[in-house]
Amino acid sequence: GAVWELWVAIADVSHFVLPGSRLDREARDRGNSYYFPTSVEPMLPEVLSNGLCSLRPDEDRLVMAERVGFDDRGIPRTSAFFPGVIRSRGRLTYEGVQEALDHGGELAGRHPYLKDAEALAHLLLERRQARGSLDFDLPEAQFIVNRSTGEVEGIKRRVRLFAHRLIEEFMLAANEAVARFLTEKGTPFPYRIHPAPDPDRLSTLFRT
C-alpha cells in the first residue's frame, strides 16, 4: 500500500483560455513565456499569468490536482486526478525552503511537511538513478544586470539547491503518473521521451 502521498496542483488555465479563442491562438503563436534577466514576456496576458492563474497566497484558485501514492521504496501505487479549488498558504522561495531544510527555523515550524517532502524527494531520486537516469547537472549562468541602464555588470554561476531538485522530482513523478494513466486508458497523446542511445554513438562517447 501507499505510505507516501504526494499532491501536485497546477493552475487550471483551460478554464479561462478556451480552445480556438483569441487568447488560445495568441498563446499558440508565442509558444512560451520568455524570461530575461530583468523582465518576463508572458505567453498569456498578465491578468492571467500573474493574476487569476497565479497561485497567490490566501486567494482561492482553480486548479487541476493530482494525488500520487508511493510505497516505502518510492514505487507509485495509486493516482487520482480531478479539478479543484485551492488556497495557497504561502509563496515560498527556493532559498527559503533550503534554509528551512538545512537549519529549521520559523519557516520549518510553519511548514513541518517540508522535511517529509525532502525525504520523499530523496527516495524518488535514488529510485530514478537506480533505473539508469542521467543527471548532467550543467552549470547555469546568472546575469547581473543594472536595472537602470540595462547593461550586464557580471555573470556568476547559479547555485543549484536541493530545493530545486525536490520540485524537479515531484514534477517528474506527477508527469509520469499522467503518462501511465493515459497509456492505460489508450488515449492518444504526445509523449516527450528520451530513447536509448545509439550503440555506435555511445561507443564513440566512451572513446573520447
What is each PLM-predicted segment?
Residues 1-208:
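Electropositive polyanion-binding surfaces
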